[in-house]
C-alpha cells in the first residue's frame, strides 16, 4: 500500500456492505449480458431435476417391461437434456467472462487514472510491489470472484431448490432428514469464513512483499554481485517465501477441512435416508423408481451444496482484494485549485518569495526564508551540500512539492493560481535519473510534443542533442526500441535523449537536476554541449553537484541547511572565500 493511506477496517459490517455495493454496482452496469447469463443458468439448472424425475418412470415402467416406448424416448431425453445443459453452461460462462473482463477493464482504468493523479509525495513513500499487486492480482480477483459468486449463487441455488422440490415430491419424510443437515453445513461454512478472510488478507500482503523482494533482486543485481550479497538476498527471499507458504498452508487447511466436515454431515443424512426408505419400501409406500429418483436427486444435490459452502472462501478473497483496490481508487488526488492559465508568450520570469518548507514528520524546516528572482532567459544555479534543500526547492516550481510558507510566481502570477496543466506545459526537466519508456527512440523523443512531432522534428532534436549520428547508425534508426529502462543505451545516450525530448517540448523554463553528475568526462562533455544548446533563450534553474558545470551561470545561489548563505557570479563567490569557494576547492583537489 501507499503509506499514509488508511486501509478499510476489516470485518466491520458497514465496510463489507459498502464493498459489496461498489463491486456489484460495476458488475450491474453490464446488466444486459448479466440477465441473459442468469436466464441461461436457469435453463441449465432446470435440466438437473428433470434428469432425476426421469428415473421414476424408467425404473417403474421401463424395467418392468410394460412400457416399450421408453427404450428410445428416455435415452433421447437424457441426451437432449445433457446437450441443452452444455449449451446453456457454455453461453452463460462466456457472458459472465465478458462481463468480468469489461468490469476489470474499467476498474484497472479507474485505478490507473487515479495513480497518475496522485501527488508526487505519495510515490516517494510508496511500496511498489504492493502497488503493482493491486493491478495484476487484486483487480483480477475482484472481478473474477464477483462473477464466480453470481454463478454459484444463481445456478447452484436454482439447482438445489429444484432438486429439493423433486425430493419433497418423491418423499417428504426423507427430504426432512436431508433438510435437518443443511443448517449444520451452513453454520460450519460461516465459522470458517472469518478465519479465511483474515488469512487471505495476510496472504495478499505477503504476495506484495514477495514481489518487492524479487523486484529489488532484479533492479539491484549488480550491487548484489559486487558486494557478494547473495546470502543476504537469499535469506530475505527465503523468509518471505516461507511466510507465504505458511499462510498458503493455513488457507489450504481451512479450505480442506470445510469440505470433509460438510460431507460427514451429509453422510449421516444419507445413512438415515436409506434406513427410512427401506422401511417405507417394505410398507409399500415407496416404489423402487421413486427411491431411484430420490437418490438421483440427492446425489446431484451434493456438488451444488459443496460449491455453495465453498462460496464463503471466494467471497472473503473478493472482499480482501476489493479493500486493496478501492484503497487506491479512494486516494486523494493531486490538488489543483488553479483557475488561471499563463498568458502567452510566457517570458519565464521566476520569483521565489520567502519560501519555507517542512516535511510532515520533521521537527524543523528543510527550507527557511528563501527569496530570489530569475529574470527571463537567465541561468541560475543552486549549489550546496547534500541535504541543503536544492531539489526540494526546485520541485516546488512544477508543484511536486508544496511550500508551507511563501509563494512562487511565474511572470508575476502566483503558481497556486495557475492550472497544473498550464503550469507544467511551460516547464521542461532533465535530471540525473532519466526516465525513458520501453518504446522506440522516436516515441520517447516525441513524448515531449505529446506524440505530435513528425520524423523531421525528431531528427532535428536528435541533431541538436548530439545524438543524430548514433541514431542514424542503427539499423532501424529512430524506430529502434530502447528496451526496458533504456537498457540498450549508455548513460550519456540516455541523457542526450532526454535533452532531445526537452528540445521537442520547447518550454520557456528549464530545470536541470544534476543532469551530468553520473557521467564520465567524455559523456559529460557531449551532454554539456547539448545542454548549452537547450538552455539558449530559456530561463534555466540548474542543480549542480559538479561546480565546474555552473561557472558560466548568470548567478549562483549557495544553500546551506535550507537557507541562502551566498549568491553571485562564479568569480565573485571564489573571491569571497565562503562556502562556495570551500566546496569548489575541495572538488578541484579531488579532480
Curated annotation (Swiss-Prot):
PROSITE patterns, alphabetized: ABC_TM1F, ABC_TRANSPORTER_1, ABC_TRANSPORTER_2, MSBA
Record-listed ATP binding positions: 384-391
SUPFAM superfamilies the UniProt entry points to: ABC transporter transmembrane region (SSF90123), P-loop containing nucleoside triphosphate hydrolases (SSF52540)
Matching InterPro entries: AAA+_ATPase (IPR003593), ABC1_TM_dom (IPR011527), ABC1_TM_sf (IPR036640), ABC_transporter-like_ATP-bd (IPR003439), ABC_transporter-like_CS (IPR017871), ABC_transpr_lipidA (IPR011917), P-loop_NTPase (IPR027417), Type_1_exporter (IPR039421)
Coiled coil: none
Catalytic activity from the UniProt record: ATP + H2O + lipid A-core oligosaccharideSide 1 = ADP + phosphate + lipid A-core oligosaccharideSide 2
GO function terms (MF aspect): ABC-type oligopeptide transporter activity; ATP binding; ATP hydrolysis activity; ATPase-coupled lipid transmembrane transporter activity
Membrane topology category: Multi-pass membrane protein
Compartments, as annotated in UniProt: Cell inner membrane
A GO cellular component entry from the record: plasma membrane
Main location: membrane
Alphabetic keyword roster: ATP-binding, Cell inner membrane, Cell membrane, Lipid transport, Membrane, Nucleotide-binding, Translocase, Transmembrane, Transmembrane helix, Transport
TM spans (from-to): 34-54, 71-91, 158-178, 258-278, 285-305
Domain ABC transporter, residue spans: 350-586
Broad EC category: translocase
EC number(s) reported in the record: 7.5.2.6
UniProt cross-references to Pfam families, sorted A to Z: ABC_membrane, ABC_tran
Domain (ABC transmembrane type-1): residue spans on this chain: 35-317
Function: Involved in lipopolysaccharide (LPS) biosynthesis. Translocates lipid A-core from the inner to the outer leaflet of the inner membrane. Transmembrane domains (TMD) form a pore in the inner membrane and the ATP-binding domain (NBD) is responsible for energy generation.
Family classification: Belongs to the ABC transporter superfamily. Lipid exporter (TC 3.A.1.106) family.
UniProt subunit comment: Homodimer.
Annotated domain remarks: In MsbA the ATP-binding domain (NBD) and the transmembrane domain (TMD) are fused.
Protein name: ATP-dependent lipid A-core flippase
Amino acid at each position: 500500500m501507499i503509506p499514509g493511506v488508511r486501509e478499510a477496517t476489516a470485518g466491520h459490517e458497514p465496510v463489507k456492505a459498502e464493498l459489496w455495493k461498489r463491486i456489484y454496482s460495476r458488475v450491474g452496469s453490464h446488466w444486459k449480458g448479466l440477465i441473459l447469463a442468469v436466464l441461461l443458468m436457469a435453463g441449465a439448472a432446470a435440466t438437473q431435476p428433470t434428469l432425476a424425475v426421469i428415473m421414476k418412470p424408467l425404473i417403474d415402467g421401463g424395467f418392468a417391461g410394460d412400457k416399450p416406448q421408453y427404450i428410445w424416448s428416455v435415452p433421447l431425453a437424457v441426451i437432449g437434456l445433457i446437450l441443452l445443459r452444455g449449451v446453456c453452461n457454455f453461453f452463460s460462462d462466456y457472458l459472465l467472462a465478458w462481463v468480468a473482463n469489461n468490469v476489470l477493464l474499467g476498474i484497472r482504468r479507474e485505478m490507473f487514472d487515479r495513480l497518475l493523479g496522485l501527488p508526487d509525495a505519495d510515490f516517494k513513500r510508496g511500496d511498489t510491489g504492493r502497488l503493482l499487486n493491486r493491478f495484476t492480482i487484486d483487480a483480477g480477483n475482484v472481478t473474477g470472484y464477483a462473477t464466480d459468486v453470481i454463478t454459484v449463487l444463481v445456478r447452484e441455488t436454482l439447482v438445489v431448490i429444484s432438486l429439493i422440490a423433486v425430493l419433497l415430491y418423491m418423499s417428504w419424510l426423507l427430504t426432512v432428514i436431508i433438510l435437518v443437515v443443511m443448517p449444520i453445513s451452513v453454520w460450519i461454512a460461516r465459522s470458517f469464513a472469518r478465519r479465511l478472510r483474515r488469512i487471505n488478507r495476510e496472504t495478499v500482503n505477503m504476495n506484495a512483499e514477495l514481489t518487492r523482494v524479487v523486484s529489488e533482486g532484479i533492479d539491484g543485481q549488480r550491487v548484489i554481485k559486487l558486494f557478494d550479497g547473495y546470502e543476504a538476498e537469499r535469506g530475505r527471499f527465503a523468509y518471505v517465501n516461507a511466510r507465504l507458504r505458511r499462510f498458503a498452508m493455513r488457507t489450504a487447511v481451512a479450505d480442506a477441512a470445510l469440505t470433509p466436515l460438510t460431507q460427514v454431515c451429509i453422510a449421516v443424512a444419507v445413512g438415515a435416508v436409506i434406513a427410512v426408505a427401506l422401511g417405507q419400501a417394505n410398507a409399500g409406500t415407496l416404489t423402487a423408481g421413486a427411491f431411484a429418483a430420490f437418490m438421483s436427486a440427492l446425489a446431484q444435490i451434493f456438488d451444488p451444496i459443496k460449491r455453495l459452502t465453498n462460496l464463503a472462501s471466494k467471497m472473503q478473497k473478493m472482499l480482501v482484494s476489493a479493500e486493496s483496490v478501492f484503497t487506491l481508487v479512494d486516494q486523494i488526488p493531486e490538488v489543483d485549485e488553479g483557475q488561471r492559465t499563463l498568458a502567452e508568450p510566457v517570458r519565464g520570469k521566476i520569483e521565489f518569495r520567502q519560501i519555507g518548507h517542512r516535511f510532515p514528520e520533521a521537527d524543523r524546516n528543510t527550507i527557511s526564508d528563501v527569496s530570489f528572482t530569475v529574470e527571463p532567459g537567465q541561468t541560475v544555479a543552486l549549489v550546496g551540500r547534500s541535504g541543503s534543500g536544492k531539489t526540494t526547492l526546485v520541485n516546488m516550481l512544477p508543484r511536486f512539492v508544496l511550500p508551507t510558507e511563501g509563494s512562487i510566481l511565474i511572470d508575476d502570477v502566483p503558481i497556486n493560481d495557475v492550472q497544473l496543466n498550464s503550469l507544467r506545459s511551460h516547464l521542461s526537466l532533465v535530471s540525473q535519473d532519466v526516465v525513458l519508456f520501453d518504446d522506440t527512440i522516436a516515441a520517447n523523443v516525441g513524448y515531449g510534443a505529446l506524440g505530435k512531432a513528425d520524423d523531421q522534428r525528431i531528427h532535428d532534436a536528435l541533431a541538436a542533442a548530439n545524438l543524430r549520428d548514433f541514431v542514424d547508425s542503427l539499423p532501424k534508426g529512430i524506430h529502434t526500441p530502447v528496451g526496458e529502462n533504456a537498457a540498450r543505451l549508455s548513460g550519456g545516450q540516455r541523457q542526450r535523449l532526454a535533452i532531445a525530448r526537452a528540445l521537442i517540448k520547447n518550454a520557456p523554463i528549464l530545470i536541470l537536476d544534476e543532469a551530468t553528475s553520473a557521467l564520465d568526462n567524455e559523456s559529460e562533455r557531449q551532454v554539456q554541449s547539448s545542454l548549452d544548446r537547450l538552455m539558449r533563450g530559456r530561463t534555466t534553474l540548474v542543480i549542480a553537484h559538479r561546480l565546474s558545470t555552473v561557472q558560466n551561470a548568470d548567478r549562483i545561489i549557495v544553500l546551506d541547511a535550507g537557507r541562502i548563505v551566498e549568491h553571485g557570479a562564479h568569480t565573485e563567490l571564489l573571491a569571497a572565500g565562503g562556502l562556495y569557494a570551500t566546496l569548489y576547492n575541495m572538488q578541484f583537489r579531488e579532480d
